[in-house]
Each structure stands twice: as C-alpha cells, then as structure tokens.
Amino acid sequence: MKVGIVSWGAYIPKYRIRTEEVARIWGDDPLRIVDVYLVDEKSVEGIDEDAVTIAVEAARRAIRRAGIDPKKIGAVYAGTESKPYAVKPISSILVDALGLSNNVFAVDMEFACKAGSEGLVAAIGLVKAGQVEYGMTVGTDTSQGEPGEHLEYSASSGGVALIVGRDGVAAELEAVYSYVSDTPDFWRREGSPYPMHGEGFTGEPAYFRHIIGAAKGLMEKYGYKPSDFAYVVFHQPNGRFPVRAASMLNIPMEKIKPGIVVTHIGNTYNASALMGFAKVLDVAKPGDKILLVPFGSGAGSNAFVFTVTDVVQERQKTGVPTVEDMLRDKIYVDYAQYLKMRKMIKLFD
C-alpha cells in the first residue's frame, strides 16, 4: 500500500536579524562568528507570533496545497521545544484553528528537535494501519538562546507541516530507521528560560553519532547507496554540521546544498530538517529519492527515504508560498527590536 507525503506547508517569519548585528552588541568579531557557524542571519518571530501561530500558518498552507477537506485529517501531531503553555497542548488548538473534526487523534510530541519527525512516524503508522485517511505532523519552534551565548547566533523561528496519506501521494515512503541513546548534549530544566548544552557533547557524541548512525543504519539495512539519492537533508543546527555529516557518508555537496536553509534563517529546531525537506519538495522531480535525517538532542535521529511521484508537479503549482519565496521576503531588525519582538525585555514593578 502506497503511503507517503501528500502535501507540505512551511512558514518563516519575515523578520531577520543579521549575525553581525548580534556580534556588534556582544563585542564579537562578526566575520569569525559567521565563519564558525556559517549563519549569515536568522528568522525572528513577530511580536504577535509564537509556536502556535507559526504551526497554524504552516498547516493551513499544507491543507491548501493538498486541496483536501480538513475534516478528513484524522490525526494531528505537534512537535516543539517552545510551547506557549507549560500545560496545554498545541495539537488541540490546531484542531479548532484548522477546522478539523473533533473525532481526531491529537498529541503534542516530545523529543527536542525531532519531535515533529516523531509525529511523522506516528502519522505514517496510523495511515498505514487504515485507522485514519490523513494524518498531519507539524514541527514548529521559536527557539531560545540566552543573550550573549553562542546559541543566540542560530536559535530562530519557523514551522513546517506535512500531511500523510494513501491517496495523492507526492513523495512515497520507502524506508524508515531510528537510532537513539541517552546522551546529555542539550537540555532545559523546568522554569529555566534558556537551554543548557554539554559543549563537547553536542558534536561527535550527539549530532554526528546519531545522524550517521541513523543514515548509515538505514542504508545498510535496506541496501541504499549515497548515489541513490537526488537530495539529502540533515538537521541543521549550524551550517557546518550537515556538510561534515555528508562528507562522512561520502555524499557529494550537490545533493545536500539544495536543502540547506540554516545559513539564511538559523536553526528553527523542530522545523530545521523539515524546512530543508520542504525546500527540496518545492523543486523535486518525479523519480527523485530523498534521504531525510532529523536529529533531536538527548539524543536520537530518524532516517526516512522518500521517492517523489508525478503528483509532486501538481502540488508545486498551487500558488502556496515556497520556502525560497519566504527566504527572499524579509525585513531586517536591530538588536533592540529583536529583544522586544522576542519578549526578552522584562519589566518589574
């Protein structure tokens, strides 16, 4: 039974702050910072935006692109690290905001930056089992970085929604694989406004071990070679990590470059790999194979292989904004505006 991505929708807030502007405030060398992280600028949510509004907009675009009745969506999953409420699901808000049926499975997923991709696994399972006609997952974040700390140069905002189904599949799922371990690379305790990270744990023991473990494990299990893929998309905490991961897997740069978005919008956390995936789907051709490998701290990676079908051409002509459209549509803000828009200026009586 053919199961896969029926539609996709993305949303990137139009506001941007340049890396050099953040570096100016903290006295860092902007050229060195850009060279280290390969992030020129990052997206910033508007004063009236949060992870929920971003998720709603991305999901509306996915539904519009699919051209389906939203009431046919029988499951909705939301993955985020930046919930507006400590106790109140985003998924239930999506049900009413999108006009879904009340007879729907709705869950907020938890696994750092790969919670949205865990929703994809769950949606695929329900559709494949015949329990729902369509399932949706949304990866959305307004990610946090402590002022003056290096995460501030990349932590950004954005969202991606994927609709899974059996009919009208634009990218058919061929294989999925997972690699997980208890690795304390990144965390945020209850009540803490900003996350902490384990410095040396974030690279080799966390990102590379799990990205490579998932991608290599999938290829070995199912017999894929790097040459089989037209596009490869990894989680993008910065501009260097995905390029290095590709090199470690002998994947040429031309296969990974089309899905790189971090240079222009920073690390959108749960939307990071999914944003690159959406960007690739915007231009992919029938027959193309796509390797998608999200990563979540704590730590784990899922690896997916999709084959693009003829339906993708119809989906690409719906007039829904592409990721490239949103990368070009931007308004720059200074650091003071950035603090205001991110509600980081606290007033006390």
Curated annotation (Swiss-Prot):
Function as written in the Swiss-Prot or TrEMBL entry: Catalyzes the condensation of acetyl-CoA with acetoacetyl-CoA to form 3-hydroxy-3-methylglutaryl-CoA (HMG-CoA). Functions in the mevalonate (MVA) pathway leading to isopentenyl diphosphate (IPP), a key precursor for the biosynthesis of isoprenoid compounds that are building blocks of archaeal membrane lipids.
Keyword Iron in record: no
Protein name in UniProt: Hydroxymethylglutaryl-CoA synthase
Protein's organism: Pyrobaculum arsenaticum (strain DSM 13514 / JCM 11321 / PZ6)
Family: Belongs to the thiolase-like superfamily. Archaeal HMG-CoA synthase family.
Subunit structure as annotated in this protein's UniProt entry: Interacts with acetoacetyl-CoA thiolase that catalyzes the precedent step in the pathway and with a DUF35 protein. The acetoacetyl-CoA thiolase/HMG-CoA synthase complex channels the intermediate via a fused CoA-binding site, which allows for efficient coupling of the endergonic thiolase reaction with the exergonic HMGCS reaction.
GO biological process, alphabetically ordered: farnesyl diphosphate biosynthetic process, mevalonate pathway; isopentenyl diphosphate biosynthetic process, mevalonate pathway
GO function terms (MF aspect): acetyl-CoA C-acetyltransferase activity; hydroxymethylglutaryl-CoA synthase activity
Binding sites annotated in the UniProt record for CoA: R240
Positions of the catalytic residues: E81 (proton donor/acceptor), C113 (acyl-thioester intermediate), H235 (proton donor/acceptor)
Key words, A-Z: Acyltransferase, Isoprene biosynthesis, Transferase
Cross-referenced Pfam families: ACP_syn_III_C, Thiolase_N
HAMAP family associated with the record: HMG_CoA_synth_arch
Annotated positions binding (3S)-3-hydroxy-3-methylglutaryl-CoA: D29, C113, S154, T202, H235, R244, N267, S297
Pathway entry: Metabolic intermediate biosynthesis; (R)-mevalonate biosynthesis; (R)-mevalonate from acetyl-CoA: step 2/3
E.C. number: 2.3.3.10
